[in-house]
Amino acid sequence: MSFKVTRIDHVGIAVKDLEAAKKFYTEILGLKDSGEETVDEQKVKVTFYPLGDSELELLESTHPEGPIAKYIDRSGEGIQHIALRVDNIEAALADLKEKGVRLIDEKPRYGAGGAS
């Protein structure tokens, strides 16, 4: 294997209403967010909650045809993805492709929080 998984980077949670979800995570669970960000390319607005070496990411679609809106229509609100941190993203993508893993992106794509 040409790469190493080093940790869980974040868990992405699809929500219909970011403000309502933020209230739960902030007021009920007592977490502090690290700000809000819009990623126009992905048609999504996000908030991250740092938790130790990982984060929770809340994602709300900014467009009815965005990937998060489609996910919620199909599966409802909840965990949409788990992002793993690797030591070499390019090597990881090439290795996974070679092993027949279906990839959403074959090259790193930068998202919220500078994630690729």
Place the predicted regions along the sequence by residue:
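N-terminal beta-strand motif that seeds the catalytic metal site of vicinal oxygen chelate
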Residues: M1-A20, E77-V86
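A short, polar/proline- and glycine-enriched secondary-structure boundary/capping micro-motif
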Residues: I28, P67-Y71
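Conserved secondary-structure micro-motifs at functional edges
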Residues: L58-G66, G76
